[in-house]
């Protein structure tokens, strides 16, 4: 006797979920094994995403070179990585002070990075500087600082390690960018400009180095949701328009550092050239920017007048 459909359907769902889980576990295991012995540079290892990447790649057996602007934080990360690690399976990380806001130091930084192991297999550029302000209030000096950290720094480091990658005809350069490298929103003029510049640079680089077997990847994500900030005790919740509040929540519903770090690992192992980590509304906005820009411009202009969107974008 055939089983009723109402019985078969739940069984199929359970079996499919089990297969999907096993598949993900196998892929995750293979991903870690693929980075073993690889020389991996993380430009901002002390950030939330950088720390997650450091733990992930360290467990996978990569030879890490960890960059950051704060030596104490780098040493703390070093201790957390090595305290419970098996020295037979992992390598002690190398630490390098790396500050993209100091462009005069970049030549020395490149030399120090290459001296660690003589080459770089994977460069992860995840350093970033953010700013939210009306255009007229942003000084030219601040514009330059943001361009140094978000564009000139990553591009200079990529140029610095490129000759060794070309000579070995292998390597991977990954830019952790932002959705605002594709879509500019109000009050993020300097930040969006720097991210657009970085996106364009690495897109050009990808085409130029493909013949040498070098992979260039970009990951465009919404904001990184490192923590939740509830309202202070006794603080009244602001009155907002329901539709505007929904749109704002979608635009600012960020990516957790652990999720982004796993995506970085998957991107490296699958050699993806471009990844967009965004929820439906930013994706729709990207489509509107391409196919119906006047409508998007009108929505953004109207959003500036709405207190909710102004605060959340």
Can you say where each PLM-predicted feature lies in the sequence?
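Conserved glycine-rich cofactor-binding loop
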Residues: 39, 46-47
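Conserved glycine-rich Rossmann-like NAD(P)H-binding loop of the short-chain dehydrogenase/reductase
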Residues: 62-77
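Rossmann-fold cofactor-recognition segment
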Residues: 84-104
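Substrate-binding pocket helix/loop in short-chain dehydrogenase/reductase
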Residues: 134-135, 139-144
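Active-site helix of classical SDR
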Residues: 158, 194
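Residue(s) in the substrate-gating loop at a strand-loop-helix junction
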Residues: 178
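SDR active-site lid
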Residues: 207-280
């Amino acid at each position: 006797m055939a089983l009723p459909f109402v019985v078969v359907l739940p069984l199929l769902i359970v079996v499919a979920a089990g297969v999907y889980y096993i598949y993900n576990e196998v892929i995750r295991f293979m991903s870690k094994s693929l980075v073993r012995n690889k020389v991996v540079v993380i430009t901002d290892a002390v950030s939330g995403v950088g720390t997650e990447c450091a733990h992930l790649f360290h467990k996978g057996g990569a030879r890490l070179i960890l960059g950051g602007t704060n030596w104490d934080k780098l040493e703390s990360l070093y201790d957390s990585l090595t305290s419970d690690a098996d020295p037979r399976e992992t390598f002690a990380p190398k630490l390098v002070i790396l500050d993209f806001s100091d462009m005069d130091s970049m030549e020395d930084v490149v030399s120090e990075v290459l001296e660690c192991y003589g080459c770089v297999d994977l460069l992860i550029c995840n350093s970033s500087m953010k700013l939210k302000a009306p255009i007229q209030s942003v000084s030219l000096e601040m514009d330059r600082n943001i361009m140094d950290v978000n564009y000139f720094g990553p591009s200079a480091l990529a140029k610095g390690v490129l000759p060794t990658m070309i000579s070995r005809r292998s390597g991977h350069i990954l830019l952790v960018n932002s959705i605002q490298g594709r879509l500019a929103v109000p009050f993020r003029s300097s930040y969006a400009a720097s991210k657009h510049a970085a996106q364009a640079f690495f897109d050009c680089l990808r085409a130029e180095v493909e013949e040498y077997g070098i992979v260039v990847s970009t990951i465009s994500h919404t904001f990184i949701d490192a923590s939740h900030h509830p309202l202070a005790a006794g603080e009244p919740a602001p009155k907002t328009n329901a539709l505007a509040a929904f749109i704002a929540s979608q635009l600012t519903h960020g990516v957790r550092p652990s999720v982004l770090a796993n995506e970085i690992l998957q991107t490296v192992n699958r050699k993806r050239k471009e990844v967009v980590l965004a929820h439906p509304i930013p994706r729709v906005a990207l489509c509107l920017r391409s196919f119906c820009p006047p409508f998007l411009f009108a929505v953004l202009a109207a959003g500036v007048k709405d207190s909710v969107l102004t605060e959340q974008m």
